Amino acid sequence: MTSNDPADPADRAEFDDAAVAGMTSEAEAGATAEGVEDVPAGVRERYADLVEQVRAHQFRYYVLDSPTISDGEFDELFTELQTLESDHPALRDPDSPTQVVGGTFSTDFTAVDHLERMLSLDNAFDPDELRAWVERVEREVGSSAHYLCELKIDGLAINLLYRDGKLERALTRGDGRTGEDVTLNVRTMDDVPDQLTGTDEYPVPALVEIRGEVFFRVDEFAQLNASLVEAGKPPFANPRNSAAGSLRQKDPRVTKSRPLRMICHGLGKREGFEPKQQSESYAALRAWGLRVSPHTKVLSTVDEVLEHIDYWGKHRNSAEHEIDGVVVKVDEVSLQRRLGATSRAPRWSIAYKYPPEQATTRLLDIQVAVGRTGRVTPYAVMEPVKVAGSTVARATLHNADQVRHKGVLIGDRVVIRKAGDVIPEVLGPVVDVRDGSEREFVMPTECPDCGTALAHQKEGDVDLRCPNSHNCIGQRRERLFQLAGRKAFDIEVLGYEGVSALLSAGVVFDEGDLFDLNEEALLKTTLFRTDDGSLSVNGGKLLANLESAKQQPLWRVLVALSIRHVGPIAARVLAREFGSLDRIQEASEEELAAGEGVGPTIATAVREWFDVDWHREIVRKWSEAGVRMADERDESIERHLTGLSIVVTGSLEGFSRDEAKELIMARGGRAAGSVSKKTAFVVVGESPGSKYDKAVQMKVPVLDEDGFRVLLEQGPEAAAEAALPAE
């Protein structure tokens, strides 16, 4: 089935939508409604035969990759099926291969519980960690095991519920216990049958939850982006995020227009089917009409597993989809049961994560950007290149000294990597391919935004800064953008475009004016007003967000002030120690530096910030506008965590990460970001990552969420008794 074939999932949406429109108009034009019993028997028989044939050929094409008819022959069958449904609307039912959800589309994404919890996976990052996991497994079960290895797809986890073979519900993973109902959208995907098939060996079970991953194929994602660019629309950043966004569309027709795929990799709750091996469950999934990865392999030793992992590490770009590792599972289900699970992950499975990818590309230019504190940072402009699952075209170069240190020239071929698979970094040039056309980067002497001469803030400082902090539009824009972020006032609708609109219209000069905004001011901007001159929906949301932001805790206000070196951690300490902005402003450097984790550098920065007249004017304006400048202290809270360093990792159900840190600090503790010998406890939620592994290795007490509550309410001695057993 070629990409030009209407039966191909990449192109079928438009074809089906046209058919639906035709069927709707004919049904509406009919004088009387035709019932199924009114359809001639021969037509009903032909329709049933076509449905069966189309399903079978889709199964052979999409699942078995072994079609038995040509693309043209399949197209004829599919078109005939559509024609019969158009001529006889009564024949249409939800199980038809041509099903398109018609009328007014609405997906509310209702929260629904999974029948069986969807756990996350522990990770291994090197061969020694994987060997240690295998040793633990075989020590626990008292014998050797077989290991099923499969590619770790970088997609969106999904849970399908089939009852008597019929798709009843599709949920996103959510928090593992509860997911979002995306059934209408999932029904539009060709890889997800409405009705399971079955064989004598593997009949369809009475009930089964099927877990899998929704993704874009690499080539189809590229085609999708090319079509978007051709249409004058911005391309998607990476396949994983665009797959998630495509599946969560409110209009299922949009989802259907995207070439989403799904590969199944496990079962949840089931009735009427008990496999003996994980690999047997995959054979059953294939028999039921679902896709399973063709790259799954069962191996007997850890050396074989590592060899398999090494192979895919070298060939990860040859898979049809993005991968970020290999999942290793104990194949025997009886051993899986004996191994059990922790509160967050099965003990019988682990994900081996690959290190960040590297790639080479052309360095087209080096430009500079001005930050919120005036720092002028050079960044690389490159030919777009695929690295670690996303397309990279820019990367920071930090400062002019780093450019010289790396030895990169404009026009070079450069090696880049994504540190932590997130932040693009230029490692250095490929010197051997230089042809003499390359040129050195010259750091500008003037601010690119306001023209002010750049200078070092102090002797020995490697960074150049624009000293025009109050009037430089670049700095004002960055400060406003930063204060709206999640770690400051968390003003949802005030993004970069909104900040630029406010500055361009002149309704704010700097951050001091932000909380004086009203409807009259927003109507002066094109972004926050409608074509008829009224306030837009986002304009109304912005005013509501600003009102809510006035009640944010003191530490967020401190972050929003853009005081150099003061991030969320230092801000929390200052807020906890002093309680109000007035007391912070009145404190000496020595008093400020006394807070744990503050020190002289931050204390000096705070003192110098308050010495500037226009900085104090911002505080005055915010205070007069009603921004909360002091925290209410609960004197009843015992400070029984004083002096203790506590690390929180993973997702907690009852607390956000910020809330957990605030509760720790309110009791005198330090919310640390890494595990060390000084760590008193590590609190783990879902997907805790390497911090949990390090805690186990260093024998630091580990608390689950219940243990964390004990720590908060009863103190460290009681929490030590509630710690999870050492693995």
UniProtKB/Swiss-Prot annotation:
Purpose of the protein: DNA ligase that catalyzes the formation of phosphodiester linkages between 5'-phosphoryl and 3'-hydroxyl groups in double-stranded DNA using NAD as a coenzyme and as the energy source for the reaction. It is essential for DNA replication and repair of damaged DNA.
User: InterPro entries, alphabetically?
Assistant: BRCT_dom, BRCT_dom_sf, DisA/LigA_HHH, DNA_ligase, DNA_ligase_AS, DNA_ligase_CS, DNAligase_adenylation, DNAligase_N
The cofactor named in the record is: Mg(2+); Mn(2+)
A Gene Ontology molecular-function term? DNA ligase (NAD+) activity
User: Known catalysed reaction(s)?
Assistant: NAD(+) + (deoxyribonucleotide)n-3'-hydroxyl + 5'-phospho-(deoxyribonucleotide)m = (deoxyribonucleotide)n+m + AMP + beta-nicotinamide D-nucleotide
Residues the entry annotates as binding Zn(2+)? C447, C450, C466, C472
Report the Pfam families cross-referenced here.
BRCT, DNA_ligase_aden, DNA_ligase_OB, DNA_ligase_ZBD, HHH_2, Nlig-Ia
**HAMAP family noted in UniProt:** DNA_ligase_A
Q: What class of enzyme is it?
A: ligase
Q: Name one GO biological process term.
A: DNA repair
Chain ranges of the BRCT domain: 636-725
Q: Which family does it belong to?
A: Belongs to the NAD-dependent DNA ligase family. LigA subfamily.
GO annotation, cellular component aspect: cytosol
Protein name in UniProt:
DNA ligase
Q: Where is the active site?
A: K152
Superkingdom of origin organism: Bacteria
Origin species = Saccharopolyspora erythraea (strain ATCC 11635 / DSM 40517 / JCM 4748 / NBRC 13426 / NCIMB 8594 / NRRL 2338)
Q: Which UniProt keywords apply?
A: DNA damage, DNA repair, DNA replication, Ligase, Magnesium, Manganese, Metal-binding, NAD, Zinc
This enzyme's EC code(s): 6.5.1.2
Q: Please list the residues that bind NAD(+).
A: D71, G72, E73, F74, D75, S120, L121, E150, R173, E213, K329, K353
